[in-house]
């Protein structure tokens, strides 16, 4: 390895220098304080867990994204977390064991094998919130509201909220009586939004009736504004009860969000299949103009706690603090800086600590550097250490 190579970081792994680090930490504290004001309790799961526990209920996508190492103590396979959700579900199911509604929040680094997000990072700082123990529309609306408030508090505007429901896709596929390979092919086409290929493939499926073909090819075209829900009712309302219930639920959620956040744009995509095997109800994502990737996303996942022996309804969202910092112009109010001689006396030591307790940033001068951005300096005047202005 050459000297130049020693400076390199792995692709998609970055570091924050002082100015950016101050912005990240300021936003992290601000958003966690916001979540606390909504009644969410902070949890700090470990960065490393046994792989089988870490991936429980998470689906194959997360398994591919997870870095794996061998535990030198036990010989078992460990995983470095790529997402917090299964960890928080384990905490709710195994550690807290509260039968009532539980609100939990988290923030920390995750590591992924493949880049994702606005800047192609593999090391985002994930922040999120979860509600356990409530399966009604009220908790869906609360989590959505907190997500939008989180983004607004971070300084983002012109938000667009994308809504969907996995029961609509699963209901259509179930009603068409397809085999596993056929379902997988359709899910692949829905994810790719490849409408011409979807139309061709639907015609090839000789097992379908004409109305079933209309359901399959019409589903990915159900995207747009609130009129989409009426179109969905017209096209899919007679398929089965689960689809009708999903459309009604989306109507209730969207009505509540429009009332609370009238400036947020609303968009529906009823064939959205992000984390299809993972979520069980309403799914959602937030976007800002000019960026194709979601800046926050979430949804309902009622089955995730079952593998930990305690199945509870759950819903939540997550975002990347570093991505939010990159999208906003965060101003961090810096404390006034005081230059101090090296604290060689008890009086100077007490004065420096007193100023720090008042919110000043007191820096001991270790060499002959210039005052720089300092605002004050400590000088011994009239038998006491006093603040004196620095004239730059």
Curated annotation (Swiss-Prot):
- Name this polypeptide is given: ATP phosphoribosyltransferase regulatory subunit
Q: Quote one Gene Ontology molecular function term.
A: histidine-tRNA ligase activity
Give the organism, scientific name. Marinomonas sp. (strain MWYL1)
Q: Which InterPro entries match?
A: aa-tRNA-synth_II/BPL/LPL, HisRS-like_core, HisRS/HisZ, HisZ
Family matches, as Pfam families: tRNA-synt_His
Name the pathway: Amino-acid biosynthesis; L-histidine biosynthesis; L-histidine from 5-phospho-alpha-D-ribose 1-diphosphate: step 1/9
Please verify whether the record's keywords include Nucleotidyltransferase: no
Localization: Cytoplasm
The record, for SUPFAM superfamilies, names:
Class II aaRS and biotin synthetases
The remark listed among the other comments is: This function is generally fulfilled by the C-terminal part of HisG, which is missing in some bacteria such as this one.
Subunit structure, as described in the record: Heteromultimer composed of HisG and HisZ subunits.
Q: Give a short account of what the protein does.
A: Required for the first step of histidine biosynthesis. May allow the feedback regulation of ATP phosphoribosyltransferase activity by histidine.
Say where the protein is mainly found: cytoplasm
Q: Sorted alphabetically, which keywords does the UniProt record give? A: Amino-acid biosynthesis, Cytoplasm, Histidine biosynthesis
For this protein, the record's Gene3D superfamilies field holds: Bira Bifunctional Protein, Domain 2
Q: Which GO terms describe its biological process?
A: histidyl-tRNA aminoacylation; L-histidine biosynthetic process
The record's annotation in NCBIfam families points to: hisZ_biosyn_reg (TIGR00443), PRK12292.1-1 (NF008935), PRK12421.1 (NF009086)
Give the family per the record.
Belongs to the class-II aminoacyl-tRNA synthetase family. HisZ subfamily.
CC annotations in GO: cytoplasm
